[in-house]
Amino acid sequence: LELETAGMLKQTKGQLGRRQQVKPEDQLYKAVSPGGWQLYWGKNSRTNDYVSRNMTGPQDLWFHAKGMPGSHLVLKCGDSADKVSEEDLHYAAAFAAGYSKGKDDGKVEVIVAQGRDVKKPKGARPGLVTVDSYYTVMVAPRRLED
């Protein structure tokens, strides 16, 4: 190994071009709503898949910009969804809008669903889900300050 790093031996095939695999949970955006609820959303289709399949519980609230590509966002509330204020709902929806194709629009329609209504079809590509039951809210897009 020392000879390989010194350049005296040729690298083995398994070591050539090997990149460190980035875990989806390391690529999430995170925020806290005004009411103290944790928000998580994906940066790409792989992390969207992780958010929708691994982080969203049956009672959590799930958000996505309607009719356009965008991040899947979860508001972690467990069985306390009825305690989430309108302000917190709109705050989360604004991030879902801000991390979608509609980020530069004045207002974006955002889907709000319970986690149990979000399903991944068998064999579907990463980031693709179906939503059985939802309602929508209109919000102005918001992004984290970079």
What do these predicted ranges mean?
Residues L1-Q38:
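Coiled-coil termination/hinge junctions
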Residues Y29-W41, T47-D146:
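Phosphate-backbone binding interfaces of nucleic-acid-interacting proteins
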